[in-house]
Amino acid sequence: MRSFWLLACLLLSLSAGAAQRVVSLAPSLTDSVLELGAARRLVGVLDGGERPAAIGDLPSVGRYGQVNLERLLELQPDLILVWPGSVPEAQLQRLRDFGIALFIAEPHSLDELALQLAALGEALGEAEAGQRLSARFREGMRRLAERYRRDKPLKVFYQVWDRP
């Protein structure tokens, strides 16, 4: 529920219009922007892994855990996409102090992830694309549940990270 209110507050703050200059501080959020057809709005990204060709020439604002605030501010973003672990809290607070809108992606469930995709589409002026991407994600999850509904649950759990 907390995430819902955070998304609602973000959308209210962006109600004057869709973000035009976006910096993504998480490769997963960059991928979502591309899926939404909003690559033209990206002006900077955080380095992390292989870059999709669509953003190959975009300036880097740092890497995981080390954001170059001066470089980021030079890009004059009106929206910054953040995965909480990708930016130290002190830097996150400085971004808030500058008054730049933040889209903080912190889903705690698959349903919240679907809501996040729709909210991101709205924030980027791609509301219909956001709804379609959210619906496609939900449908994919439904198909997986249907496909494996009769299988015995696995007795093994492999955790990649303790704070996904």
Predicted regions and their residues:
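Extracytoplasmic substrate-binding proteins
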Residues: 18-21, 89-164
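Intrinsically disordered, low-complexity boundary segments flanking structured domains
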Residues: 11, 32, 46-48, 142-147
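A short, structured surface patch at a secondary-structure boundary
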Residues: 20-21, 25-75, 79-91
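Bacterial N-terminal signal peptides
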Residues: 4-13
